[in-house]
Regions:
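Extended, well-ordered alpha-helical scaffold segments
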Residues: 11, 15-19, 61, 131-140, ...
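Terminal-appendage/accessory-domain detector
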Residues: 1-108, 205, 210-220, 227-470
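Hydrophobic alpha-helical hairpins/lids featuring a short glycine-rich hinge
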Residues: 94-149
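Well-ordered alpha-helical scaffold segments within catalytic/enzyme domains
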Residues: 53, 119-126, 172-178, 225-229, ...
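Well-ordered alpha-helical segments within folded domains of soluble proteins
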Residues: 112-120, 167-174, 219-224, 283-285, ...
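Aromatic-lined, polymer-binding surfaces characteristic
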Residues: 143-169, 215
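Flexible glycine/proline-rich, aromatic-decorated loop/lid segments
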Residues: 192-200
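Structural helix-adjacent loops and short alpha-helical linkers that scaffold large soluble proteins
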Residues: 125-137, 180-187, 235-238, 298
Length: 470
């Protein structure tokens, strides 16, 4: 008798087996220079977010739970080595802490904050090169992105957090390559990860902080699933298309077209968008259009009578994006397109400080005067492009408008600048330069785990401050 977890369901090849075989067999040297460069930029961007978010409550809470162990994995910006699952959890929460993490629009998921913490935590336990770590991450992004494209709809994303749904598969496949599992073991890890899909979007309606912990749950679960598979645990191969598998359970429909990784040699990581500001992905292009409008309005926002925002249906439908207040927490403001646009118009800038002005009377006046609509053309172009148009009617009856066909991503120089500032504030300028140099040449590194050690506080023995007893 053969258990399904160790073979195919009913004697037929499953979608999971085909996907896992492709993920595990992708050659380390099979990715183009452009793909590798994008992966390194995403890695640096992730680290910049993790360093900058260290003082925030959710980052501190996650770090406080990390259990010190000998020869463990390191937390970004801390000194103590911890259990790999604890490190993955804390580093994922910190990477998500600013709401500036990278974004894959087609899956509506933040893949970097589940993939990189898993890869870096495991790279300290299992000896892999930088090239192997980069390839593992690229495969992880690809896995999450392709599954996400197949399953995520605006209706599903209204209830479930896409990062929590597809992230476990992404992190498990990235980690399987670092750990060195064989295909059957990786398939079992993949199936186990399917049982860790979770994350509800109620936080977007309340502003509560559970959102920040979603990637942490994913990364920690992925490490656990990999350990279980390595020890012989089995899982359902039909986890994707089965009667009670991922697609029927969450999408309420069967799996359609088979999911293929790297079709025609294209890598999904190249479709990842690096945010210029710490706010919801869907608020980025409307705020950028609003900034162009603000620069054309003489005398400031007090001359504005009304605001009209046109963008994609996905943006309008995503939980929290159409919120008009009241805003009790900055997270609610970061999710709200009307708030983001109003704050940009009122302050003439897109900045983190905008989202601290929850009681600003002028921002509130503009939010109340705002109409948010889905535009058919922008909707048709999504997710390849994320367009937006902002039209303001002035009190004198004239109008000012600006439109973007697509969001403007943070560029290489911006990502490097904010990494340097954040890392240097924690570790000093010399250490920050060493980290950046290692990331730049990561494909030549003989020990990928050295990067995680570089990101830790050198020589520190004190564990993260604990606020919750064990």
């Amino acid at each position: 008798m053969r258990l399904e977890g160790a073979g195919s369901a009913g004697g037929h090849a499953t979608a999971a087996r085909a996907l896992v075989q492709s993920a595990m067999q992708a050659p380390v040297d099979g990715f183009s220079e452009a793909v590798m460069a994008k992966a390194k930029l995403c890695l640096l961007d992730y680290l910049s977010c993790a360093f900058e978010a260290l003082p925030l409550p959710w980052s501190r809470q996650a770090a406080a739970l990390a259990m010190p162990v000998a020869n463990g994995s390191h937390l970004v910006g801390h000194g103590t080595a911890c259990a790999p699952g604890d490190a993955a959890f804390a580093n994922a929460v910190a990477g998500h802490g600013l709401v500036r993490e990278d974004m894959h629009a087609g899956s509506v998921a933040h893949l970097g904050v589940v993939v990189w913490p898993t890869v870096l935590a495991l790279a300290e336990r299992y000896p892999v090169t930088g090239a192997q770590a980069l390839a593992a991450a690229i495969v992880g992004y690809e896995t999450g992105a392709r599954i996400g494209r197949a399953i995520v709809t605006p209706e599903l994303a209204g209830l479930f957090r896409p990062t929590g749904l597809v992230g476990p598969f992404a992190a498990a496949m990235a980690g399987a390559r670092v750990v060195g599992l064989d295909v059957d073991q990786a398939l079992n890890a993949f199936g186990l990860a399917g049982n860790c899909c979770a994350g509800l979007n109620q936080w977007a309606h309340t502003g509560a902080s559970e959102m920040y912990f979603h990637p942490g749950f994913v990364a920690r679960s992925a490490v656990l699933c990999l350990d279980l598979a390595r020890l012989g645990a089995t899982a359902s191969e039909s986890i994707l298309e089965g009667e009670a598998g991922t697609f029927r359970a969450y999408a309420r429909r069967p799996l359609g077209t088979p999911i293929r990784l790297f079709p025609d040699g294209e890598a999904e990581i190249c479709a990842v968008f690096n945010k210029p500001v710490p706010a919801c992905n869907f608020a980025q292009s409307p705020c950028q259009a609003a900034l162009q409008v603000a620069r054309q309005v003489a005398g400031g926002s007090r001359g504005i009578e009304s605001v009209r925002i046109e963008t994609t249906h996905a943006a309008v439908a995503y939980p929290g994006c159409n919120a008009t207040g009241p805003f009790d927490y900055p997270l609610q403001a970061k999710m709200s397109i009307p708030f983001g646009v109003a704050a940009t118009l009122a302050r003439g800038a897109i900045a983190e400080a905008n989202y601290d002005r929850l009681d600003d009377a002028e921002i509130g006046r503009l939010v109340a005067a705002t109409t948010l609509l889905a535009d058919p053309a922008y909707t048709a172009a999504f997710p390849a492009r994320q367009g937006a148009r902002v039209i303001v009617t002035l009190k004198d009856g004239s109008a000012v408008a600006s439109a973007l066909d697509d969001v403007e991503a943070a560029g290489d120089a911006s990502i490097r600048r904010r990494f340097t500032e954040a890392a240097a504030a924690v570790l000093g300028g010399e250490r920050a330069r060493r980290i950046e140099a290692m990331v730049d040449g990561f494909e030549h590194a003989s020990d990928a785990g050295e990067l995680a050690r570089l990101c830790a506080v050198p020589g520190a023995e004190a564990r993260p401050e604990r606020e919750i007893g064990r």
